[in-house]
Swiss-Prot record:
Reaction(s) the record says it catalyses: L-arginine + ATP = N(omega)-phospho-L-arginine + ADP + H(+)
Residue sites binding ATP per the record: 122-126, 185, 229, 280-284, 309-314
Protein name: Arginine kinase
Locations listed in the record: Cytoplasm
Function: Catalyzes the reversible transfer of the terminal phosphoryl group of ATP to L-arginine.
Record-stated family: Belongs to the ATP:guanido phosphotransferase family.
Binding of substrate, residues: 64-68, 225, 271, 314
Pfam families found in the cross-reference section: ATP-gua_Ptrans (PF00217), ATP-gua_PtransN (PF02807)
């Protein structure tokens, strides 16, 4: 059973959400009294409670979603809350739906999105992975962080050819290395307030680190928001090359480290928005005519299931007219379909930009 102190915090949090009339999060929308009462006393095998799930959304009433999964089991234990939120966010994922098996597809059908180099500054494809047998951030101990870092860094040190590189632990990092990684926009900072309040930043910087290849086109973040964020990126719009590099890397890592996978939700992640393929294919792009009004840009993008963010990602503004545009759907479709959705949408948006007066 859940202890009284936690229950009191849960009741107070529920009341706060109910009274926050300007809160538009999916948490507030779907955490009804019935749902709340049905799961407030539950606990996972690793000790996670509903408070671990909702505390970030209770603290940050401006959250879009407002919940995180403290461990893999939470998706089932707190299903009455996760299920409707996942269905809502991913544009329809019913209780009977299942995420399809991994399918990278025919890489040769992908193209360079902007061969003339007029619009796209860079292209990036990333996916998140969790290591089997470990909980997610809020439930990890300092020892587990170290153990995971050891497993991952030794796996990455065996990367070959284009993927060969160096692992830089955040613990004890020299100022010079730190500055270089900041200049390259590679260094992740301790989490923002959404992650902080989800308890995703405990024992920082223990167990956290960054691996990148010599060409700086392949990158792995270790124990940031997810256990692993595997990233392929480069300047320009050559999506085919970027995607192919990611596929090679993920398959390579997966052959050595078992990932946390669920028959219904696909690959499991800390945030329910990333479930399934966990894949986010994005471009940094300038579309000055379409972007005269960000709202218009967002409306156009959403027609293609694309999402617009500021230059430096979520919760940021555009700098110099550069936007980050990516696929929104990650669940209920294959990796190939997700990357195709981004490709086809961006090609259409470039066409519209060229045609605009």
């Amino acid at each position: 059973m859940v202890d009284q102190a936690t229950l009191d915090k849960l009741e107070a949090g529920f009341k706060k959400l109910q009274e926050a009339s300007d809160c538009k999060s999916l948490l507030k929308k779907h955490l009804t009294k019935d749902v709340f009462d049905s799961i407030k006393n539950k606990k996972t095998g690793m000790g996670a409670t509903l408070l671990d799930v909702i505390q970030s959304g209770v603290e940050n009433l401006d959250s879009g979603v407002g919940i995180y999964a403290p461990d893999a089991e939470s998706y089932r234990t707190f299903g009455p809350l996760f299920d409707p939120i996942i269905d809502d966010y991913h544009g329809g994922f019913k209780l009977t739906d299942k995420h399809p098996p991994k399918e990278w597809g025919d890489i040769n059908t992908l193209v360079d999105l902007d061969p003339g180099g007029q619009f796209i500054i860079s292209t990036r494809v990333r996916c998140g992975r969790s290591l089997q047998g470990y909980p997610f951030n809020p439930c990890l101990t300092a020892e587990q962080y170290k153990e995971m870092e050891e497993k991952v860094s030794s796996t990455l040190s065996s990367m070959e050819d284009e993927l060969k590189g160096t692992y830089y632990p955040l613990t004890g990092m020299s100022k010079a290395t730190q500055q270089q990684l900041i200049d390259d926009h590679f260094l992740f900072k301790e989490g923002d307030r959404f992650l902080q309040t989800a308890n995703a930043c405990r024992y920082w910087p223990t167990g956290r680190g960054i691996f990148h290849n010599d060409a700086k086109t392949f990158l792995v973040w270790v124990n940031e928001e997810d256990h692993l964020r595997i990233i392929s990126m480069q300047k320009g719009g050559d999506l085919k090359t970027v995607y192919k590099r990611l596929v090679t890397a993920v398959d390579n890592i997966e052959s050595k480290l078992p990932f946390s996978h669920d028959d219904r939700f696909g690959f499991l992640t800390f945030c329910p928005t990333n479930l399934g393929t966990t894949m986010r294919a994005s471009v940094h792009i300038q579309l000055p005519k379409l972007a005269k009004d960000r709202k218009v840009l967002e409306d156009i993008a959403s027609k293609f299931n694309l999402q617009v963010r500021g230059t430096r990602g979520e919760h940021t503004e555009s700098e110099g007219g550069v936007y980050d545009i990516s696929n929104k759907r990650r669940l209920g479709l294959t990796e190939y379909q997700a990357v195709r959705e981004m490709q086809d949408g961006i090609l259409e948006m470039i066409k519209m930009e060229k045609a605009a007066a």
